[in-house]
Structures are given as C-alpha cells and as structure tokens.
C-alpha cells in the first residue's frame, strides 16, 4: 500500500478543530481569554459555512462550546489540553489504488517538550479522530507537528528542519533518518523520489 498526502488545497470532507481550554495560553486576563474563545468560535463558524466542522471539546468546556458554537459545528467530547489541531492531529493520507483513507499518527511532544506545554491528552487525538472517521492508522516513529510539513500532493514534501531535526523532538535524527521516516509514512508518491 502506498499512501499519498493530498495537497492542502484538495477537496476534503471535514475540518477538525479543538476547542480552547481555560488556563492554557489564552491570555492572562478574563478579557483576553474571552477574545481567544471568540476567535476560535469565529473561525469554526466561518469554516462551517462552507465545510463541515467537528471540534474536540474537553468535558470542562462543553457548556461553553455549546453556548458559543453554532449548531452545525459537531461537538465531539474528548480530553483536550493542547488545541492547535494542525500540529497534534492526524495527517490524512489516501491510497489512490483502493481509495482507502489513512491517518498518520505522528508522535507529538508539545513542540519539543518545553516546561510550559501540556500535550499528553491531545497527543492521542490522531487515533481518536482516525477511529471516528474509519481511517487506517499509519504509525510513525517521528516526533513531528503537522505544521512542520507541506506537500503538493504530487510527490513533493517540504520539511521544517527546526522541527524534524530538533534534538528535543528527534534526539538521534539526521537528514537520512528523517527522510526514511517520511518515506515509511509514505507522504511522497512514489516513495523513491528525492525529499
């Protein structure tokens, strides 16, 4: 099976988000925190006008999410500590021969395990979402964030050295190991093209 990550501009069925959690990088004042919640709500609302949205919401935030989000946004209750879904969520891939959907489960450690970050709950979101949509889980040995990779859907992948080669993320990584890990998760098609 060969997986291909479609370009970000390719049609897709749904946008996955995570709702903010009180006390996690939303601001030092009540006013700033409310602005943060309002911004997340505005994004979810704008996207939902064109594309279905599902949003993971921590049990402690369900009442607020139901009050703030429009009814067309699907609320999925799940433990959340980090809410930058692009970084800790799955990377969806497709097997073009069978049409099967896969979800790469990168290892997420809160951007290199800084003292301030809380990510243990959200590190499991890739598998939770894969299960919810019936995608095959594509495991990875690479500590990565989804925002650290970009593809064109035709075999080109751009990586961010400050992510993949960061010793706080991938202690023993060098270019060859990162390229092998990316080839293992089959982000390029065919996998023998230069990365």
Please place each PLM-identified region on the residue numbering.
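Hydrophobic alpha-helical segments and helix pairs
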Residues: 159-160, 179
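Internal alpha/beta scaffold segment
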Residues: 176-183
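Beta-propeller domains
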Residues: 46, 52-53
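Cofactor- and metal-binding active-site motifs of prokaryotic enzymes
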Residues: 14-28, 32-41, 54-150, 155
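Conserved small/polar residues in nucleotide/adenosyl-binding loops
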Residues: 185-191
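A short secondary-structure junction signal
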Residues: 115-116, 160-163, 167-173
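N-terminal basic/disordered segments at the start of proteins
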Residues: 1-16
């Amino acid at each position: 099976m060969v997986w291909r990550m479609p370009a970000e501009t390719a049609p897709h069925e749904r946008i996955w988000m995570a709702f903010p959690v009180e006390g996690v990088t939303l601001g030092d004042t009540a006013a700033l925190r409310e602005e943060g919640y309002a911004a997340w709500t505005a994004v979810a609302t704008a996207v939902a006008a064109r594309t279905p949205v599902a949003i993971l919401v921590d049990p402690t935030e369900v009442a607020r999410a139901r009050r703030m989000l429009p009814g067309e946004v699907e609320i999925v209750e799940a433990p959340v500590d980090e809410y930058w879904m692009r970084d800790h969520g799955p990377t969806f891939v497709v097997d073009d021969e069978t049409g099967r959907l896969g979800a790469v489960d990168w290892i997420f450690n809160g951007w290199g395990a800084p003292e301030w970050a809380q990510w243990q709950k959200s590190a499991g979101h890739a598998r939770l979402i894969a299960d919810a949509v019936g995608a095959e889980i594509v495991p990875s040995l690479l500590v990565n964030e989804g925002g650290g990779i970009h593809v064109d859907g035709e075999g080109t992948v751009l990586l961010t050295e400050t992510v993949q080669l960061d010793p706080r993320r991938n202690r023993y990584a060098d270019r060859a190991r990162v390229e092998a890990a990316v080839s293992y998760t089959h982000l390029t098609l065919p996998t023998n093209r230069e990365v």
